Each structure stands twice: as C-alpha cells, then as structure tokens.
Amino acid sequence: MLPRKLKIDSTELAEITNELVQFLNCLVLRSGGLKKEHIWVRNGRILDERTVFFEEKTMADVQIDCEGLILSPGFIDLQLNGGFGIDFSTYNSDDKEYQEGLALVAKQLLAHGVTSFSPTVITSSPETYHKILPLLKPSNASSEGAGNLGAHLEGPFISADKRGCHPEQLVITSLSPNPVEIIEHVYGSTENIAIVTMAPELEGAQEAIEYFVSTGTTVSVGHSSAKLGPGEMAVLSGAKMITHLFNAMQSYHHRDPGLIGLLTSSKLTPDHPLYYGIISDGIHTHDSALRIAYHTNSAGLVLVTDAIAALGMSDGVHKLGTQTIHVKGLEAKLDGTNTTAGSVASMPYCIRHLMKATGCPIEFALQSATHKPATLLGVSDEKGTLDVGRLADFVLIDKNVTVKATFCSGKRVFLAQD
C-alpha cells in the first residue's frame, strides 16, 4: 500500500499512534549542521531508516511534507519562573490550583516550540518548598504540554548582596555547621530537583555541592559575590553551570575576574566541563557581552529565558514569588527599584537575538537551546537531539525561528495559524 501523503496542517497528525511516519522535505538539525534528510518516527521515537529499508523492508504508512522548513529538536528551557499569568514560586495552599497553573504554562509553551523545561522557584520559605516540590514531578512532553525536567531551585543559598529581586528575609547565607541537614530542612526531599543555583563562597557550600552531585542534582553557581577561586573549587566539586552569566555576580575585573572568569579557567577539563545559562533578550545582557561570551566559550553557551509570569501577558503589574514586578515591553523591574527581575522574552526570541547579536549561525543558536541543555542535565539519550532512539519531540521552524508546528512523541501538538 502506498503511503498517505499529508501536509503539516492535516488534522490526522494529532492522532497518529503506532504508524510508521516519514517526515520529508525538511532541513534536519544535526551536530554537523542542517542536513536535507528524512526523519522516521514510530511509537513516539525516532527510527533508523536503515532498519526500515534493510530489515523491515517496508514503506511509510504516512509521509509528511515539511515544506522545506527546519526540523529541530524541541527547545529546552532550564530557567523558567512561570508565564501566562502563572508564577511557579507562588503557592496558595491549594495543590490542585498549583498543578493547574503548571499545566497551563506547559500547554502554552508548545506554541513557543518548547517541549521540555525546568520550572524555576526563586528564594522561598521552607514551608513553600515543602508544598511545591512534591508537585513538580518530572514528566515527558505530550499533547497536554511540554515535559517537566524537574525543578530549578534558584536559592535560597545565595549572596545577600547579589540577591537581585529575591526576598532578602528568606536568603540563607551559610550552610554551616551541617550542610546536609540544612538542605533537607529547607527543601525537604531532593527527589524532584534537577538544578540548584547557589553561591559557592558561602560557608559549607563545597560540602553542599558534593551532596547535591551525589543525589544527581546539577549544581549551578550564581547570585554570588564569589571571586574566581571559590568558583573553581565549585567546578572541581562537581558544579556544571553558571546561572544567567553576567547577572547577579561580580563584574569582571582583570585582577580577579570572579565567576565570569570560569569561562576561560584552566580548571575546565573533559572531566569538569562547564555550561553557562545566558539570557539573550537584549535587556539582561548587552550585545557586546553576548559576543564576549560567544567568542570566549561558545561550547558552554546555553540559552535560557528566565521568563516570569508576565511571559505572554500584557504590560502591567505581575508577581515573582512574594515580589511585585512592573513590566513594560521587554523590561521587568522590581517594584520601587531599577533591579531587573526576570524576562518576558520567549525562547524563539532569544534564539533570534543571539544570532543577531553575535552573528552565529542558526545551527549554533538552535543547539544552544536543544542539545547543550540536554547534555548538561544528562538527558541527551532521550531529548535534545534527533538521533535514533530519541523521543520524537521536535519543532518545525522557518529561517526566522518562527514556530510553524510542534510535535511531541511524533504527534502534532501545536499548529501555527496563518
């Protein structure tokens, strides 16, 4: 039987289950760049076309014409505070309400091409963590929304001087005398935690980093007054990331470059790699700083949005945890201050801006929102690439990174309306 030939706007694409599907006429994002290839999918995963041809000796049940679009892995956002009116740091004593808000954000992210994210909780009280964290169980992407990679806890173990918009009264500036006991008291279980941002100069921080690493949690250094030395010690202890590079840390100084100096540290080795999140929205990070990061350590660059509840909403007053935020255009400011308080930029916007600011090729920008964050979190065997065996979570975009359609496990879950 000949394959059924469909366009990306066919209603059938939202219902496909165990059929053999071939995506044609697309530019596929590979490690070596964009390649004019086909993608084969069945039962939600990417197949090896050699298996189809030489072992199964079969034809596709369905062929989908991708109309020359770029087929990229779904975008991965490792720092997302909320969006669409929902703030992940706000808990109103109602588990169902919180879960409904989380589900709403996950659903809306599909229109942005985001298929996996880490819901981010800023500095909060132990009571809040104990209520929220059990509700942030990891999940895969589906027609219901983007997958949850586990929580990114940004605080409370940070520098009071570099707290940014985090509530000062909840910041914890020492993990002494018993870091593990303090962590367990503050967070409760670490089961649903994917990333912890902490300041490496705090007393007890190195032991805390080693503990987090032993639990499989990724440690990111940030919101910190640290000089380079404590940052390097953190990397040697297992920290793998810098949180929103250039923001909430010491400025670069030629005698002690602080955490920014980690980008060129001699301590970085294949055994101790380092990634850094960067907010490419034209507000948090000047284009010149983006270029410095890109040309200094391009391999570690990971795009994050740091978006807040105002993402996808109109200008006005919004919340970030217990803090009040004023949003105008792409700028979000803490009430009564000039402190930048998260972003309202989408991931496609950040990808476009990185290309514009640095002149990097689209392949690099896309890898920085797909393969690199997946590798950082250790989930690249399932997500972040279009290699054989991976989940068929991908996005069809044009050269301007306009999202045309999003697929999760091979099913179309979002279609842009012309």
Swiss-Prot record:
A divalent metal cation binds at E154, H223, H244. It catalyses: N-acetyl-D-glucosamine 6-phosphate + H2O = D-glucosamine 6-phosphate + acetate. Binds 1 divalent metal cation per subunit. One of its GO terms (biological process) is N-acetylglucosamine catabolic process. It holds the Pfam family Amidohydro_1. The keyword Metal-binding applies. InterPro entries: Amidohydro-rel, GlcNAc_6-P_deAcase, Metal-dep_hydrolase_composite, Metal_Hydrolase. It comes from Caenorhabditis elegans. Its cofactor is a divalent metal cation. This is N-acetylglucosamine-6-phosphate deacetylase. NCBIfam families: nagA.
